[in-house]
Amino acid sequence: MSAVAEIIQTEMPAPFVFTDSAAAKVAELIAEEGNPDLKLRVFVQGGGCSGFQYGFTFDEITNEDDTTMTKNGVSLLIDAMSYQYLVGAEIDYKDDLEGAQFVIKNPNATSTCGCGSSFSA
């Protein structure tokens, strides 16, 4: 009797979610800048009233330790240190009565401040 091994390939879930809304806004901002090499860098740094805060910037350079996600032709970069705090997070863009802004829904945050710009983990 011969043994047949069945290999089942499953797609690994993405480490974070980059929404269509966020990708569309980033594409719009990159078009305004006129530099197609720009990528959105999302990072975590110390600060804020809860200990950590999120930051957003444009970057032309992808570092060796960056995690990259591309959606609708737009690239999002997260450095290795920030990655551990953002695993499972959703990076979104909201434009509603409260204003227009990038929003991070982070399941790793144990608490957030009232303004939502800082968190503790």
From Swiss-Prot:
One function term, GO molecular function aspect: iron ion binding
> Where does the secretion signal sit in this chain?
none
Give me the residues that bind iron-sulfur cluster, please: 49, 113, 115
Relay the cofactor remark from the entry.
Answer: Binds 1 iron-sulfur cluster per subunit.
> Its Gene Ontology biological processes?
iron-sulfur cluster assembly
Instruction: Tell me which Pfam families the record gives.
Output: Fe-S_biosyn
Q: Which cofactor does it need?
A: iron-sulfur cluster
Q: Which UniProt keywords apply?
A: Iron, Iron-sulfur, Metal-binding
Judging by the UniProt lineage, the source's domain of life is Bacteria
HAMAP family linked to this entry: Fe_S_insert_ErpA (MF_01380)
Q: Which family does it belong to?
A: Belongs to the HesB/IscA family.
User: What is the protein's quaternary organization?
Assistant: Homodimer.
Biological role stated in the UniProt entry: Required for insertion of 4Fe-4S clusters.
Full protein name: Putative iron-sulfur cluster insertion protein ErpA
Source species: Polaromonas sp. (strain JS666 / ATCC BAA-500)
